[in-house]
């Protein structure tokens, strides 16, 4: 089976985290992840969504790609609100939480978060969560 990508666009509001978690869980189940891996995937998805949501975007786009048992979730935050940027201390805490849930997390800063790349800590499963703002 080849790459299958689903693109979902959500308003950057907490109510939509549940819908994104369910979509990620469905794709994870289809890709053959076990229940613990799906739970971890849902947690990473929530944290990445929260991180971008609170940065001041109006919408968050999530691309979920399944390719023969591996998953990749890419997030893009679009249409920033002016003047609604969180304090750096809150950003540091959120980034630390996301990093603690993953094997590797690289952050690039330029006033706001430019990119967060994290590889899931699931042993044999190849799961990546990417958060980036464009």
Question: What do the PLM-derived regions correspond to, one by one?
Answer:
Residues 1-4, 51-134:
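Conserved beta-strand-loop-beta-strand hairpin that lines the nucleotide-binding pocket
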Residues 1-43, 54, 132-134:
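Bergerat-fold GHKL ATPase/HATPase_c domain
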Residues 48:
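Hydrophobic residues in the alpha-helical elements that line and stabilize the ATP-binding pocket
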